Regions:
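Intrinsically disordered, low-complexity regulatory segments
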Residues: 1-179
Length: 179
């Protein structure tokens, strides 16, 4: 069985550019394949923090007496309109012939969170690498793939983005319902 490395970009257009440079030119359902690579994509945030009523059905109705809403254990959920692409990514990540997963989402906090949310919800245990590029020029892409870093080097960015998301959620849910 041939071995593959899976690359996940933030959006289809970026995935197509990356795939062209690394030789993954065969179109499949939700990804491209070739030259030992599979390249797929998120469509922005495929997953996000669960709505308040996911934590307790009583939060479906807005009541002042229920404030503040402070989840003890945060839940990430896949958006209903994004389930198909998530399922494709989950299947690809956990395929037995995939040896590692490369996060090629945008270089920054949100790109890190977009990828990590999918990686974690898919319960992927494969080694994770990070493609960090600031240009879509072919030479920059080749250089980026030649210098992949361990995904764990970017844990701080994921943590920062997740803290921002939780803070937005807390302020948004509680302040909106308060006023």
């Amino acid at each position: 069985m041939a071995q593959h490395k899976l690359v996940i970009a933030e959006k289809p257009s970026v995935a197509q550019n990356l795939a062209a440079v690394i030789g993954a030119t065969v179109r499949k359902d939700g990804y491209l394949e070739g030259n030992g690579w599979r390249v797929s994509w998120c469509v922005g945030h495929l997953a996000g923090l669960a709505d308040a009523d996911s934590y307790d059905p009583k939060y479906a109705k807005w009541r002042y007496d229920d404030l503040p809403i402070l989840p003890e254990h945060w839940q990430m959920v896949v958006g209903k309109d994004k389930k198909k692409q998530f399922d494709i990514l989950k299947k690809l990540m956990n395929a037995p012939d995939v040896t590692e997963v490369v996060n090629a989402c945008d270089a920054g906090r949100e790109g890190e969170l977009i990828f990590r949310s999918v990686y974690e919800l898919a319960d992927c245990q494969k080694p994770m690498k990070r493609l960090w590029i600031s240009s879509m020029e072919d030479s920059a892409i080749r250089e980026g793939f030649a210098n992949l870093r361990p995904g764990a080097d970017y844990d701080g960015l994921r943590d920062a983005a997740l803290c921002r998301a939780k803070a937005d959620w807390l302020v948004g849910i509680n302040a909106t319902r308060l006023f």
